[in-house]
Structures are given as C-alpha cells and as structure tokens.
C-alpha cells in the first residue's frame, strides 16, 4: 500500500502534471513529495520509532550537512521529509548533495531495519539542503484516498 501510494502520487499522469506545474510556477521550489504516509507514521509510533530523526540519524545528518558546507543544525519542526526517499527535485536545489561523494559502499547491506542508518539520515536531508540553499519544499498529494487501503476498515 505504501509503495502504491508513493508511486501513484509521484508518477500517475495527474500527479506528474501537477508537480511540473508547481515547479513551472515557482522558480524557488526545490523539492516536492507526497505527504507522509499515515499508516507508516502510525506503525512507527506504535513500534516506538519516532518519525523525526533518532540521535544516530541526527549525528549523521550533521556530518553530511557539514560535508556539503551547509549549516546542519535544525529543529524537529523542520523534519518535513519524504518517507521512502521518493520525490521530485530541481537539480540546482540539491547540487551539494549530488556532489558530496557518497558511495554505494557507505551504506549497510539490506535489510537495514527502520532507523539509525545512513539511508535513514539521507532520507531526511533533501528538504534541509533545499531550504539552506534558498529553495522551498512542499508536499503535493493528488491521491489522498489511497492513504488507507479499504481492507483496513473491514471487520
């Protein structure tokens, strides 16, 4: 359900057109992604895993931001990110991230669990990079009805 939600809200024709229109109408828009998937957030909360950064992820985020030459400190209120690391972006907005030299070898082998890894820290980075570079970030959800699959409400 989560993958369907992300793919539909990123790649369905209506979502693509809405996203392209948003970028065309706002030259300072740097990153667009669907709203955080509600069932994922509920599952994380139930498991005791915060949807904002853990202390391990926070430390990795600070290191990555420093590596890119950008201010790293941030408030939890800035934790607005794409769960699943699937989004549209303006290349100039994320240039430091694209050039920071991350390699495949920097990431642990799968399965990686639900938090505390470089992949989870990296998931939270794009909006921070965009805003530090003067770009805006927004969520755009064209198909909110697929947030909760029908079987969730059956007895």
Regions found by a protein language model. Give the residues of each.
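ER/Golgi luminal nucleotide-sugar-dependent glycosyltransferases, focusing on the catalytic module
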Residues: 1-155
